[in-house]
């Protein structure tokens, strides 16, 4: 039974049993800072289980794409070396939101697994576990399903604390939780391993295939378990694992999905064996990287993008190990789309983007390796002792993306040790910085306890009278806030826009009969809109009538920039192509910043085109319309949804420009007519990560100011080059070209002088035990010229050791060369190190060529004079 057939059968079975088939959610969790990537089927229903969201169905089934790489759930280093570890996997699941419970859930699982209409697995091969005190589940398995009691195992608190058990599931320290029952397949006594709960349970004999979680309690901060009024069910069965069982193989990499990918990888890599762990790594990583890119993640140095970058580079590194000499990952995408594109249409739609991103990242990695090798070489030249410091290893990895394992390979070649303890100290410090910055480290159940909601009125008004529902001093509720005290204010209604969708929160003032609260920012906390600031006069009390007034100037300026962002997005897609997608934005009163997916820098002509298109839409002065509709209707109208944003069942659709030039889902504040924007100008365009570009732009008065200052600067330049606005650019180009030409001529003169001086020095070489030895100083010569001159002298002298030094900017540069045959006894690296240390510096390199330097110039003559004796000592 093929993997695709198992997936279809699972969804069909539960659909027949009244479940809504829900599409897999994105691998990027929407509006959930606790989670790096979607790693379980229940992630998209988290708010439903917590009672914060309501769906129009109470039972659902999914095939959810998942990634476990980075963060708490990290399988990356095990991938390729075990039978069942993956960075990407599919989780089949069925869910009940207060509908059915234990009896139905257990019966559904058993019927699907064992019925001849479905998977038809031998019942005698199945063993189940239940939580030790879950008598209800035990009774259902034993007396209703008919599983022999000796194959029902009770698992207690086996992790050192109450309710800490393999068979008790918890969302966090507090919140929904409950027992679970797991179904295992017994491969038989000929396979090593014991049953669940036994000392040798980690063997391969008993393999877990399905986990059924019963959410029946709410755990409070005091550790008490309170029954939920509507218990729920969350189940999960890994597609790869059940496919291995159904296809009679013991490794997930032997199932049909992987076998075809492995064969394709072998072909692309010139026939490498599919048994190679390297190919299993590549087959796994092409799945996770491709799906992540399809869901909008791009390689970068922070957050989710850094994990993607690590996955891609790990795959590329393993490709290099089996002979890859050029980028190859992008060549595997077509086969992946062929295998999984029907089940996941977003993969097929993004094929071109995935291929380009992978190719670009592999090319960048090749450059990184080259740069990293040079940096490592430099660090080794400065090394004191035989151990590479942990900080150096960390910097190469963290700043330059240079793999730790590659640093280790080079260390072994040089007989050097690695300070991995120091590396771990640096890594932990980075993790601490990330936690303190709040990157994916927020506790979902922590924060303000706000049990009230606010209505936003700011689309139609910027001021009004409302009621103060709640006050907070820090995270503590307060009855009043007094003068000078910082805090938070929640109103029943408010015209203040809470930060969202890249638009900053409003500022302004809240006034009561007894005081004034200055609002510095506005944010959303659950269903409440929170005004952040401080009391500037008197005091503010709960229950008072509050006159709220938004800073009109800042709101208007922000609206200009937000509306311009929509026009910019549409213009970029028109000029660059439909692959352009928003990756992030910042909209405030001063400017707009827009990050978007694109694979190369924009040309000046493309920037000019985009500016012209946006300004044409501004001059058209068309009205901006908003309409609230269902998500399906919005999609039919062509509205763009933005990466990383969370949308409800109904959405606000914003249309602007001629012939609906731009249609997007947006809850932000905007101009009434495009002409209100006034003017649009792009101030800069640059890259922020591989495949991501950033535009910073201005509108209205700031745009006019920018144009005027740019014009004044151009006039100043024209005067300096004795031209005018029309000829200034050509004159500057001519000056630059002339400067380059003069620099070349200066370098040539320096090289000739060095060569001439070197030729003269050849006569000064001393015979040391049949070897010509020359140590001398050349004035006014840079390091490159020194190296060229050393090569010339080696060729001229024959069997020779040459060391030359020059002084520039208060530092001595040293280059040494030894002819090939003699470098076995006299090593250039050792020679440079000996001389550099006398000058208070460092040096090193290859046996035939090395370089270094020092700062104690007064010792240079003595250091050069010591060379002959040192060489004699090396020759013995």
UniProtKB/Swiss-Prot annotation:
InterPro entries given in the database record: aa-tRNA-synth_II/BPL/LPL, Ala-tRNA-lgiase_IIc, Ala-tRNA-ligase_IIc_anticod-bd, Ala-tRNA-synth_IIc_core, Ala-tRNA-synth_IIc_N, Ala-tRNA_ligase, Ala_tRNA_ligase_euk/bac, DHHA1_dom
Cofactor note: Binds 1 zinc ion per subunit.
Keywords for this protein: Aminoacyl-tRNA synthetase, ATP-binding, Cytoplasm, Ligase, Metal-binding, Nucleotide-binding, Protein biosynthesis, RNA-binding, tRNA-binding, Zinc
Record has Calcium as a keyword: no
Keyword RNA-binding among record annotations: yes
Localization per record: Cytoplasm
Biological role: Catalyzes the attachment of alanine to tRNA(Ala) in a two-step reaction: alanine is first activated by ATP to form Ala-AMP and then transferred to the acceptor end of tRNA(Ala). Also edits incorrectly charged Ser-tRNA(Ala) and Gly-tRNA(Ala) via its editing domain.
Record-given protein name: Alanine--tRNA ligase
Source organism (scientific name): Hahella chejuensis (strain KCTC 2396)
């Amino acid at each position: 039974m093929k993997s695709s057939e198992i997936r279809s059968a699972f969804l069909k079975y539960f659909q027949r049993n009244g479940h809504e088939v829900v599409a897999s959610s994105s691998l990027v969790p929407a509006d959930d800072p606790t989670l790096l990537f979607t790693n379980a089927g229940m992630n998209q229903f988290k708010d439903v289980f917590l009672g914060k969201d309501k769906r129009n169905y109470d039972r659902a089934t999914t095939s959810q794409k998942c990634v476990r790489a980075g963060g708490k759930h990290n399988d990356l280093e095990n991938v390729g070396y075990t039978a069942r570890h993956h960075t990407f996997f599919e989780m089949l699941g069925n869910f009940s939101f207060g509908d059915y419970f234990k009896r139905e859930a257990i019966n559904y699982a058993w019927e699907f697994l064992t019925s001849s209409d479905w998977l038809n697995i031998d019942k005698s091969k199945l063993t189940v576990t239940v939580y030790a005190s879950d008598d209800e589940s035990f009774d259902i398995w034993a007396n209703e399903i008919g599983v022999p009691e000796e194959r029902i195992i009770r698992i207690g608190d086996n992790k050192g604390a109450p309710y800490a058990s393999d068979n008790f599931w918890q969302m966090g320290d507090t919140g929904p939780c409950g027992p679970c029952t797991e179904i295992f397949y017994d491969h038989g006594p000929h396979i090593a391993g014991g049953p669940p709960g036994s000392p040798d349970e980690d063997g391969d004999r008993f393999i877990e295939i399905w986990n059924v979680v019963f959410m029946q309690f709410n755990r409070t901060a005091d550790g008490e378990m309170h029954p939920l009024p509507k218990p729920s069910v969350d189940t999960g069965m890994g597609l790869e694992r059940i496919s291995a069982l159904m296809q009679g193989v013991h490794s997930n990499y032997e199932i049909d999905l992987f076998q075809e990918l492995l064969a394709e990888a072998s072909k692309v890599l010139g026939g490498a064996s599919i048994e190679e762990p390297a190919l299993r790594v590549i087959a796994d990583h092409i799945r996770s990287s491709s799906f992540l890119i399809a869901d909008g993640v791009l390689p970068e140095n922070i957050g989710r993008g850094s994990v993607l970058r690590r996955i891609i580079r790990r795959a590329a590194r393993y490709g290099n190990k089996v002979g890859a000499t050029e980028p190859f990952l992008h060549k595997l995408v077509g086969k992946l789309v062929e295998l999984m594109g029907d089940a996941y249409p977003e993969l097929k739609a993004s094929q071109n983007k995935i291929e380009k991103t992978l190719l670009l990242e592999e090319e960048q990695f090749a450059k990184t390796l080259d740069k990293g090798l040079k940096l490592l070489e430099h660090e080794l030249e400065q090394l004191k002792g035989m151990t590479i410091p942990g900080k150096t290893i960390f910097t190469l990895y963290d700043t330059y993306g240079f793999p730790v394992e590659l640093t280790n390979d080079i260390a072994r070649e040089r007989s050097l040790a690695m300070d991995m303890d120091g590396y771990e100290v640096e890594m932990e410090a980075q993790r601490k910085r990330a936690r303190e910055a709040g990157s994916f480290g927020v506790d979902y159940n922590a924060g303000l306890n706000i049990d009230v909601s606010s209505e936003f009125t700011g689309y139609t008004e910027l001021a009004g009278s409302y009621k103060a529902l709640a006050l907070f001093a820090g995270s503590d509720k307060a009855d009043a806030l007094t003068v000078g005290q910082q805090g938070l204010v929640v109103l029943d209604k408010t015209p203040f826009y809470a930060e969202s969708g890249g638009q900053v929160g409003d500022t302004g003032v809240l006034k009561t009969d007894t005081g004034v609260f200055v609002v510095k920012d506005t944010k959303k906390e659950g269903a409440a809109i929170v005004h952040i600031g401080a009391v500037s006069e008197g005091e503010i009390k709960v229950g008072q009538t509050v006159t709220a007034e938004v800073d009109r100037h800042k709101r208007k300026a922000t609206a200009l920039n937000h509306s311009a962002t929509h026009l910019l997005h549409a213009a970029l897609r028109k000029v660059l192509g439909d692959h352009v997608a928003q990756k992030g934005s910042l909209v405030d009163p001063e400017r707009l910043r827009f990050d978007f997916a694109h694979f190369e820098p924009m040309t000046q002509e493309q920037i000019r085109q985009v500016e012209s298109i946006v300004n044409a839409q501004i001059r058209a002065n068309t009205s901006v319309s908003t309409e609230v509709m269902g998500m399906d209707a919005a999609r039919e109208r062509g509205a763009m949804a933005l990466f990383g944003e969370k949308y409800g069942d109904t959405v606000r659709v914003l249309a602007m420009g001629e012939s609906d030039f731009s249609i997007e889902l947006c809850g932000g504040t905007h101009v009434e007519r495009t002409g209100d924007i006034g003017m649009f100008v792009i101030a800069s365009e640059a890259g922020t990560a591989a495949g991501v570009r950033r535009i910073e732009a201005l509108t209205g008065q700031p745009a006019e100011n920018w144009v005027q200052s740019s014009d004044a600067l151009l006039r100043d330049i024209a005067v300096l080059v004795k031209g005018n606005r029309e000829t200034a650019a050509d004159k500057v180009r001519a000056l630059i070209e002339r400067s380059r030409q003069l620099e070349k001529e200066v370098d040539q003169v320096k090289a000739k002088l060095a060569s001439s001086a070197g030729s003269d020095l050849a006569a000064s070489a001393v015979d040391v035990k049949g070897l010509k030895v020359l140590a001398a100083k050349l004035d006014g010569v840079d390091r490159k010229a020194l190296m060229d001159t050393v090569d010339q002298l080696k060729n001229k002298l024959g069997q020779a050791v040459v060391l030359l030094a020059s002084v520039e900017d208060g530092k001595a540069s040293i280059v040494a060369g030894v002819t090939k045959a003699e470098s076995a006894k006299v090593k250039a690296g050792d020679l440079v190190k000996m001389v550099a240390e006398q000058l208070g510096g460092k040096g090193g390199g290859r046996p035939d060529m090395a370089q270094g330097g020092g700062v104690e110039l007064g010792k240079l003559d003595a250091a050069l004079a010591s060379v002959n004796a040192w060489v004699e000592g090396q020759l013995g």
